[in-house]
Amino acid sequence: LTGLFLAMHYTPDVESAFASVAHICRDVNFGWLIRNLHANGASFFFICIYFHIGRGLYYGSYLYKETWNIGVVLLLLVMMTAFVGYVLPWGQMSFWGATVITNLLSAVPYVGTTLVEWIWGGFSVDNATLTRFFAFHFLFPFVILAMTILHLLFLHETGSNNPIGLNSNADKISFHPYFSYKDLLGFAILLVALASLAH
C-alpha cells in the first residue's frame, strides 16, 4: 500500500527522480513516514523471510519439493524486486553495481553487447533503465502474490510437517484464539519496531 502512494508522486526520470523523492519526504503529507515504512517494511519483510527459510530448513520442509522450489523462486523474485526498487530513489545505480553487472553480461561471447543494451535499454544505465526498473518494481509484487498462492496450494496438497506419520488430530488445537493471538502479537511487535524506526 505504501508503494502505491509513493508511485503517485514518484518520477522515473534520471534528472528528477531524486528530487521527486525529496519532494515526497518534504512536501507530501506524511510522505516521510510513507517512504520510511516502505523501505524499513521491506527490510523487516526480508527478516521474516529468513526466519521462514530457517524454520523450513530446521523442520526438513525441503522434502516437499514443489513447495520448496516455489519458495526458492519466490525468494529470487523478492530479491529482484528489492534490487530494482533500490535503484529508484537515486535515479541511477551505484557505478560499482552497474559496472559489475555490465561486465558480467558483456563477457558473454557474440551476444554480450546486445545483452547489455537489451537489459539497460542503452549502452549504460540511463532513463530507459530507470523507467523499466520502476515498471518491474510495480509489477513483480503481483507475480509474487500469484506465486505465494501456488506456494500455499502445494503446501495444502501434503499438509505441513509430520515426520512420524502418526495421526495427530488429538493434539490439534483450534486456530482461534490460540494461533490468531500469537500471530497478532508478532504483528504488533513488528509494527511497533517499524514505527520506532520512522523518527
Curated annotation (Swiss-Prot):
This is Cytochrome b. It comes from the Eukaryota. The lineage of its organism: Eukaryota, Metazoa, Chordata, Craniata, Vertebrata. Keywords: Electron transport, Heme, Iron, Membrane, Metal-binding, Mitochondrion, Mitochondrion inner membrane, Respiratory chain, Transmembrane, Transmembrane helix, Transport, Ubiquinone. It is a multi-pass membrane protein. CDD domains: Cytochrome_b_N. Pfam families: Cytochrome_B. PROSITE patterns: CYTB_CTER, CYTB_NTER. InterPro entries: Cyt_b/b6_C (IPR005798), Cyt_b/b6_N (IPR005797), Cytb/b6-like_sf (IPR027387), Cytochrome_b_N_euk/bac (IPR048259), Di-haem_cyt_TM (IPR016174). Component of the ubiquinol-cytochrome c reductase complex (complex III or cytochrome b-c1 complex) that is part of the mitochondrial respiratory chain. The b-c1 complex mediates electron transfer from ubiquinol to cytochrome c. Contributes to the generation of a proton gradient across the mitochondrial membrane that is then used for ATP synthesis. It comes from Sarda chiliensis. A ubiquinone binds at residue 156. The cytochrome bc1 complex contains 3 respiratory subunits (MT-CYB, CYC1 and UQCRFS1), 2 core proteins (UQCRC1 and UQCRC2) and probably 6 low-molecular weight proteins. Belongs to the cytochrome b family.
